[in-house]
UniProtKB/Swiss-Prot annotation:
Phylogenetic placement of the source organism: Eukaryota, Amoebozoa, Evosea, Eumycetozoa, Dictyostelia
Compositional bias per record (Basic residues), positions renumbered to this chain: 327-338
Compositional bias ranges of the Acidic residues kind: 553-566, 610-621
Name used for this protein in its record: Uncharacterized protein DDB_G0290587
Renumbered residue ranges of the record's region Disordered: 38-90, 226-629
Compositional bias annotation for Low complexity: 47-56, 77-89, 231-247, 254-318, 339-383, 401-421, 487-523, 567-577, 593-609
Regions of compositional bias (Polar residues) in chain numbering: 57-76
């Protein structure tokens, strides 16, 4: 872990990206809380001097005070003096950077305050103390500790949950990092609402009323703005410089070949054989061969496109240095990042990374493919040739990560000056694509001033807050009509059998009839049939969809059913005159048991009042009353009357669980629709909207107006209604 990668410096980066107004509001809010070291006057002269030196360019002049001398880079000399800016005598203007030390000081105070109040950390508090105010002091103190004590401190902070073997530097880094995270989180909770809203506007996040959720969102967004020092270090280490010198090429013994031997085909009709020879395609004379190429950067004339192809003395290829281009999309050439050049007719190709890519230039330019990646610091002679090869399949293994010894760039440009810039740009793009750093999650939201419970950095992830406090679980019961539609489409009946699918739905009192069980007897035929049983209002109806579509036969069969029902009278589901196979009888019992999920064991409702209670007193001992046992709960959720009418629970029962989740998990849509019908509430086809209607009705006590149109009657129901209207008209 490098010395510059102090967690405080990394974590303070997002604060520097906030607006000056937000930082000013934060400092003012901290001043109102009277946290130590939060006033502008507390900014020491040394901190002001450091800020001024950071803003001062390297070439600015400095003054001498007390015999102190400074270099041109504003660094102190060995005599231990101090430096001052030329403008130090002018009145100090508070700018954005002056607020950062104040905020950082408060964060450290909160960090150490949290550190010394961790449960069971008396020994750790004695080791660290409470007077440390700078990040370097904690690092220095931790390095003095015995390895055993350091490990004990690391364990007390809860940072060893998933770490088996970790060195001392990593332990110290994680301790500092966790402290800073805790400090920032506690500071956010002490800021006022106005400051937090300003933070949200700068970070472009949604303002929330929940304080914990708002601070967690700010922490998550600020973490994403942190920049890892590893990225800049790698980029600086892998930057190449192009130099052009007029010298004789080095001896052949110091070069290695990296040319692939794959057979290549040019974009023109010319075919390049799989040999070490190269084909030159240029419109003007290239640069003389006496100009060597440094750091594997190709330099060409204004209208010449050249690819570096180093060869050894024997003219053979080095097998260990062979590189395969990456696979491009069929018909679409893969473009590498390039820098805009002045308007010329020569192509500019720039390839970044270790694995070379294929770039196709406009039709008037020559197509160039970069296929070499020599090691760093190997000087290869420039060749006046252009290698054109089609894209081949990418290697099965992924390309290795960029390192200091392997990260080189091969660039083909038109001028020497632009080559260096393009090379640096391409390598910076390559390094930014690498993983940023290890994840560090947010902290637990504090419910009070008690210390937070730390967990392991790098292994945690922020947990998103639920949008709704009521967690709605998916309905486990089958939705009405869903089983029949699905089974009817997937059934595969044989020529001599009939496929039967059973679906359970809630009864509706509007279409209840006296018959308890009706069955359409199907004759075995060679035609395919699909039969669907639907339980509605306690009465089984069989709906047949015959391929011939004979509606008259269905009407005749339905009339026969009614005559049979009239002769048999009201019957129980358990005793039916239908002759069916044993599997259908078993399904009958299953359907009867399904009612027990909603009903009670008697017909009087166990104290629940309904519209038909007065009429049901004489029918309590009737043998035709169905007995449905409640298996899910001892509480009454509704029941059926003797005429198969479903009675929904009363208001008192629903008020027990007025939450949306209670209605969602314990009632089907048909239950809720029946409830809406009894209390003259609007009906809706979706369960969510129906629940909302019921909840609004229970809270307000008034039923909204009916907006839906009355259902249009069809078939026998329409004829019956018409007959009743005629009779009423005749009687009047």
């Amino acid at each position: 872990m490098s010395e510059s990668a102090v967690p405080a410096d990394i974590i303070m980066q997002p604060f520097a990206k906030l607006s000056e107004e937000s930082l000013k509001l934060a400092v003012e809010s901290l001043n109102e809380l009277k946290i130590p070291n939060t006033t502008l006057a507390s900014t020491t002269a040394e901190q002001q001097q450091q800020q001024q030196q950071q803003q001062q360019p390297p070439s600015s002049s400095t003054t001498k005070e007390g015999g102190a001398t400074t270099t041109q880079d504003n660094k102190l000399t060995a005599n231990g003096g101090t430096t001052a800016d030329n403008n130090n005598n002018k009145p100090m203007v508070i700018n954005k950077l002056d607020y950062l030390p104040i905020i950082k000081s408060n964060i450290w105070d909160e960090s150490y305050g949290w550190l010394t109040t961790i449960p069971n950390s008396e020994s750790f508090a004695q080791i660290i103390g409470t007077t440390i105010k700078e990040g370097k002091d904690i690092k220095k103190t931790l390095y003095i500790l015995d390895p055993k004590q350091l490990k004990e401190s690391f364990n007390l902070l809860g940072l060893d949950q998933q770490e088996n073997s970790i060195d001392t530097n990593e332990m110290i880094y994680k301790i500092e990092e966790e402290m800073m995270m805790q400090g920032i989180f506690k500071i956010l909770f002490k800021l006022d609402k106005k400051t937090l809203e300003s933070f949200c506007r700068d970070l472009k996040i949604q303002i929330k009323d929940d304080m914990g959720a708002l601070c967690d969102s700010i922490m998550s967004t600020m973490y994403d703005l942190e920049e890892s020092p590893d990225t800049t270090t790698t980029a600086a280490a892998t930057t190449t410089t192009t130099t052009t010198t007029a010298a004789v090429p080095p001896p052949p013994t110091t070069t290695t070949t990296t040319t692939t031997t794959t057979p290549t085909i040019a974009s023109t009709p010319t075919v390049v054989p799989p040999t070490n020879t190269t084909t030159t395609t240029s419109t003007t004379s290239p640069i003389p061969s006496t100009t060597p190429l440094t750091n594997t950067t190709s330099i060409a004339a204004a209208t010449t496109t050249t690819t570096t192809t180093p060869t050894d003395n024997s003219g053979t290829n080095s097998p260990n240095k062979e590189t395969t281009p990456s696979k491009a999309k069929k018909g679409v050439p893969k473009k590498a990042p390039t820098k805009k050049q002045p308007a010329t007719k020569s192509p500019t190709t720039e390839t970044a990374g270790i694995v070379p890519t294929t770039t196709t230039t406009p039709p008037q330019a020559t197509t160039t493919t970069t296929t070499t990646t020599p090691p760093t610091n190997i000087i290869a002679p420039k060749t006046n040739s252009t290698i054109i090869s089609p894209p081949t399949e990418a290697p099965s293994k992924p390309a290795p990560k960029t390192s200091k010894s392997q990260a080189t760039t091969t660039t083909t440009t038109t001028t020497v000056q632009s080559t260096t810039k393009n090379t640096e740009k391409s390598q910076n793009l390559t390094n930014t694509e690498q993983p940023k750093k290890k994840l560090r999650s947010s902290l637990d939201k504090p419910s009070s001033d008690k210390p937070l419970t730390p967990t392991l950095p790098g292994k945690r992830e922020r947990k998103p807050l639920p949008l709704d406090p009521v967690h709605l679980q998916p309905e486990q019961k089958s939705k009405p009509g869903s089983g029949s539609a699905q089974s009817a489409s997937t059934a595969k009946p044989t020529p001599t059998t009939t496929t039967t699918t059973t679906t359970t739905t809630k009864p509706k009192s509007t279409i209840a009839k006296t018959s308890t069980s009706t069955t359409i007897k199907s004759k075995p035929t060679t035609k395919k049939k699909e039969t669907t049983k639907i339980i509605t209002n306690g009465k089984r109806k069989r709906k047949q969809d015959n391929n011939n579509g004979n509606e008259e036969a269905a009407a005749e069969e339905q009339e026969e059913e009614e005559e049979e029902d009239n002769s048999n009278g009201i019957q129980n589901n358990n005793s039916s005159n239908d002759v069916e196979i044993n599997s259908e009888n078993e399904s009958d019992r299953e359907q009867n048991d399904n009612f027990s999920n909603f009903g009670s064991s008697n017909g009087n409702g166990n104290g629940l009042l309904s519209e038909d209670d007065d009429d049901d007193d004489d029918d309590d001992n009737n043998n035709n009353i169905m007995d449905y046992q409640s298996t899910a709960s001892s509480e009454i959720k509704g029941y059926y009357t003797h005429d198969r009418k479903w009675i929904c629970p009363s208001f008192d029962y629903i008020k027990k669980g007025i939450e949306r989740g209670f209605l969602q998990n314990n009632f089907n849509l048909s239950d809720l629709l029946e409830y809406c019908k009894i209390h003259d509430l609007p009906k809706n086809k979706t369960k969510t909207k129906t629940i909302k209607i019921i909840l609004d009705f229970v809270e307000t006590g008034t039923a909204p107006q009916q907006t839906s149109k009355p259902k249009k009657l069809v078939g026998k129901a329409a004829a019956k209604k018409k007959l009743q209207d005629q009779q009423e008209l005749a009687s009047s």
